[in-house]
Amino acid sequence: MVAVIVVALSFDYTNGFHDAANAIATSVSTRALTPRAALIMAALMNLLGAFLGTGVAQTVGSGIVELPEATASLVVVLAALLGAISWNLITWWFGLPSSSSHALIGGLIGATLASVGIVKWAGVVEKVLIPMVVSPVVGFLVAYLLMTAILWAFRRANPGRVNRGFRISQSFSAAAMALGHGLQDAQKTMGVMTLALVVGGYQSDFEVQWWVIVLAAAALAAGTYAGGWRIMRTLGRRIVHLDPPRGFAAETTAASVLYTTAFVFHAPISTTHTITSAVMGVGATKRLSAVRWGVAGDIVTAWVLTIPMAGLVAALCYWVLRLFPAL
């Protein structure tokens, strides 16, 4: 059990440094914030966001897979986490902003299929696959419309003054984005830790304990401060060149989508998918060629591969762990 908790917190930490760039890349790219100031702010807001709810944790822990209450089920959870961490590290190494959230869910599905557990496919479709498709589309369209409205509203204003104003505003939109990341992503680790406590027989109901919330929040904040510079560069510069108004529009859109899905639908969506699609949406208001679609294509490929590849690695981890009699 201790090993599962430690590995879960390690996943949370890697989630922090892997996804930290999502919250702050646009602000750093537009020079609204210095990298160090952005990282400190993102770490603090991630910490706060983790305390805002447990609805997503309930979905991840009880709505995706069903495992029997047995020590063997702890091995499934451990393998799921190892599969997710492995895929996170692979995509981080290559600078691809794949989704830590979907890596975790892919890991849970893969390890469960390799064992005697049951995958709740209706829950996977409703809470994972549909939001996985819808949230980037909504992010793209809303960001495009918001940026179009901003361009119209400030069409006669002095560009220099507009940029300065939005550069200041970006401090707030980046904070909102980081808060949304903490709200969404810390809960996923809370959900897995609580799942482990339930299947291990340490608690009977699926109630997220206060110490689980504190540990998940702290691990995510620490990982966020460690930073993710490779991915920050991909999001902030390689997809599209951003100015402060576009950075503000992208962050505001992404934060709104994160809050809505967490509080209203309790759906574990990807922070990465959401902000990347929003960045593409604001970039498309310049002209479609302003978005570097080749880079966007690489990112989409990584998205599509995340769930099956993390699942495959998790299944392999499960089979390897079962070779040890003590497990």
Regions found by a protein language model. Give the residues of each.
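Multi-pass alpha-helical transmembrane bundle typical of ion/small-solute transporters
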Residues: 1-327
